[in-house]
């Protein structure tokens, strides 16, 4: 009987060990399956994020094409004349809300392109805002992003406003020369949009 009890005991232990190893392998399989699901979930999230970036880039391109169709294109920029009069900060905020900035000419060719576009799109307008100012340091004119301006096209005796006139204007009557003006003056303006590569 003791022998039978030992055999039964060994059988029970064997069955328990078999069940335990079966549960352990099922647990490992579930754990591995969960890891694969998490990996796939991460891959899907990455793909969705990539698709959103592509969709947003396409939306930006479409918006830029609309701007270029309504305005004019010059090299890697589009210009769009805005409606109404605004002071410098309002004009810049309006351009930013459209995805651009106030125009900043960086060459004589760009001055000529702006003169031509300004005559066509802003008939009768003598001057308009540029995205150039010296609000931070008197006499040190920078663009909207705070970068120093390397190309300058000031009219004779300009800038002359000292601390009262810190924002730059493009003058049609002075053949595209610049002058400084009080930033709170209301003027017309042109927004520029950079065309991505």
From Swiss-Prot:
GO MF term set: carbohydrate binding
GO cellular component, as recorded: extracellular space
Protein's cellular compartments: Secreted
CDD domains: CLECT_tetranectin_like
Signal peptide limits: 1-24
SS bonds (residue pairs): 68-78, 95-191, 167-183
Keywords: Disulfide bond, Lectin, Secreted, Signal
PROSITE patterns, sorted: C_TYPE_LECTIN_1 (PS00615), C_TYPE_LECTIN_2 (PS50041)
Coiled coil feature spans: none
GO BP of this protein: ossification
Record flagged with keyword Transmembrane helix: no
Keyword rRNA-binding: no
InterPro entries: C-type_lectin-like (IPR001304), C-type_lectin-like/link_sf (IPR016186), C-type_lectin_CS (IPR018378), CLec_Tetranectin-domain (IPR051663), CTDL_fold (IPR016187)
Pfam families: Lectin_C (PF00059)
Sequence ranges assigned to domain C-type lectin in this UniProt record: 74-192
Function comment: Promotes cell adhesion to laminin and fibronectin.
Protein name as annotated: C-type lectin domain family 3 member A
């Amino acid at each position: 009987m003791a022998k039978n009890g030992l055999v039964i005991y060994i059988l029970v232990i064997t069955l328990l060990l078999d069940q335990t190893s079966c549960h352990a392998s099922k647990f490992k399989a579930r754990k591995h399956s969960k890891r694969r699901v998490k990996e796939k979930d991460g891959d899907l999230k990455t793909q969705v994020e990539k698709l959103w970036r592509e969709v947003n880039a396409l939306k930006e391109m479409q918006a830029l094409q609309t701007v270029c169709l309504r305005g004019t294109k010059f090299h890697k920029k589009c210009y769009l004349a805005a409606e109404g009069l605004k002071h410098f900060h309002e004009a810049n905020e309006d351009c930013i809300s459209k995805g651009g900035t106030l125009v900043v000419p960086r060459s004589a060719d760009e001055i000529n392109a702006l003169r031509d576009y300004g005559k066509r799109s802003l008939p009768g307008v003598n001057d308009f805002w540029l995205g150039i100012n010296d609000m931070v340091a008197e006499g040190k004119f920078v663009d909207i992003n705070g970068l120093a301006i390397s190309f300058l096209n000031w009219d004779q005796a300009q800038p002359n406003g000292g601390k009262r006139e810190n924002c730059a204007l493009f003058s049609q009557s002075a053949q595209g020369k610049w002058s400084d003006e009080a930033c709170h003056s209301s003027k017309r303006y042109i927004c520029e949009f950079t065309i991505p590569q």
